[in-house]
Amino acid sequence: MRIALGIEYDGTHYYGWQRQREVKSVQEALEKALSKIANHPVEVQCAGRTDAGVHGTGQVVHFDTTAERQMVAWTMGANANLPKDIAVRWAMAVPDEFHARFSATARRYRYVIYNHVYRPGILNSGVSHYHGELDVEKMQQAGQYLLGENDFTSFRAVHCQSRSPWRNVMHLNVTRHGRYVVIDIKANAFVHHMVRNITGSLIAVGRGEQKPEWIQWLLAQKDRTLAAATAKAEGLYLVSVDYPAHFGLPEMPIGPLFLPDNLN
């Protein structure tokens, strides 16, 4: 039997999603909890492997099990055995052809910046902080140059293992909500550090160091060394993953925190 789960987590105290030796990972904690419910070792496959410090409100995983349990056992039981910073939001049986990664048609991320002269005290690990003024209109204008199918070498980590730098960005919106600036980006997939590298360069535009057209120029150069520094992990969230409708996966509020689904 194959089961899909929706997962939410605070990535602050983890070395990323992927299981690794001798360090804490979200995957390892989830697999341990599910294995207790299943009474056999469980290995999960995820929609997107997030880096150290990155959060998730819309991560999707699947696993195979021989255990016969009601869906509530996978949600309530797993949550009872998980650390407080990881939670299962939903569970459902899926056909064997469903795959959390390969069946996905798009991933969506949100990067949240606390834009105020003083750093936050409560949400310091859930948002990034920038103290200077940010021109959100110019950031929004700059982001539109990244729409469509492009070679994202300029926004790709040097050690990225993806075979191709080409990705299709479906939307990229930058909006202000009081002291918070949110970068909302959706693509078929992302190369390593793509959202954080784009964010770093959009911040350079927002603070007046570069013009919006610089982003278009960067894209054409296909040179990571010309772009701005990678933005911090703290403000980044994997908020949703799209799948073909026939799988019937639940639709949940994407957040994070106080943010509505529609930011416009």
Swiss-Prot record:
Keyword Membrane set for record: no
Single Gene Ontology MF annotation: tRNA pseudouridine(38-40) synthase activity
InterPro entries reported for this sequence: PsdUridine_synth_cat_dom_sf, PsdUridine_synth_TruA, PsdUridine_synth_TruA_a/b_dom, PsdUridine_synth_TruA_C, TruA/RsuA/RluB/E/F_N
EC number: 5.4.99.12
Catalytic activities: uridine(38/39/40) in tRNA = pseudouridine(38/39/40) in tRNA
Keywords in alphabetical order: Isomerase, tRNA processing
Family: Belongs to the tRNA pseudouridine synthase TruA family.
Annotated PANTHER family: PSEUDOURIDYLATE SYNTHASE (PTHR11142), TRNA PSEUDOURIDINE SYNTHASE-LIKE 1 (PTHR11142:SF0)
Protein role: Formation of pseudouridine at positions 38, 39 and 40 in the anticodon stem and loop of transfer RNAs.
Subunit (UniProt): Homodimer.
Protein name listed in UniProt: tRNA pseudouridine synthase A
Organism: Vibrio cholerae serotype O1 (strain ATCC 39315 / El Tor Inaba N16961)
